UniProtKB/Swiss-Prot annotation:
Family: Belongs to the DsrH/TusB family.
Compartments where found: Cytoplasm
GO biological process terms, semicolon-separated: tRNA wobble position uridine thiolation
PANTHER family: PROTEIN TUSB
Keywords assigned by UniProt, alphabetized: Cytoplasm, tRNA processing
InterPro entries reported for this sequence: DsrEFH-like, Sulphur_relay_TusB, Sulphur_relay_TusB/DsrH
Known partners and oligomeric status: Heterohexamer, formed by a dimer of trimers. The hexameric TusBCD complex contains 2 copies each of TusB, TusC and TusD. The TusBCD complex interacts with TusE.
Superkingdom: Bacteria
Cellular component GO terms, alphabetical: sulfurtransferase complex
Protein name, as recorded: Protein TusB
Job of this protein: Part of a sulfur-relay system required for 2-thiolation of 5-methylaminomethyl-2-thiouridine (mnm(5)s(2)U) at tRNA wobble positions.
One of the Pfam families matching this protein, by short name: DsrH
NCBIfam families documented for this protein: PRK13510.1, sulf_tusB_dsrH
């Protein structure tokens, strides 16, 4: 399943998101959700320990001035890659 986090993790039920992640799922951070990718924030460690790949939409990182601040564990992607993720996963959950 593809999970998309478009809101700040501080304004989301992040614990519920983590509970619903399964091995093989993927998480895309976009819009204000990209703040979860900033190195050193409290949500990043939970994402590192999850059995998933975590991506961040590069355009949203650039728009928020965060490109130099994200963790190396987060994979920046563009809109073409976003489309590939949606095609790959038949189910999607938006947060």
């Amino acid at each position: 399943m593809l999970h998309t986090l478009h809101r700040s993790p501080w304004l989301t039920d992040f614990a519920a998101l983590l509970r619903l992640l399964s091995e093989g799922d993927e998480l895309l951070l976009l819009q204000d959700g990209v703040t979860a990718a900033v190195d050193g924030n409290r949500y990043l460690e939970s994402l590192r320990n999850a059995p998933i790949k975590v991506y961040a939409l590069n355009e949203d990182l650039i728009a928020r001035g965060l490109t130099g601040q994200i963790s190396n564990d987060i994979i920046p992607i563009d809109y073409t890659d976003f489309v590939r993720l949606t095609v790959k996963h038949s189910g999607q959950m938006a947060w």
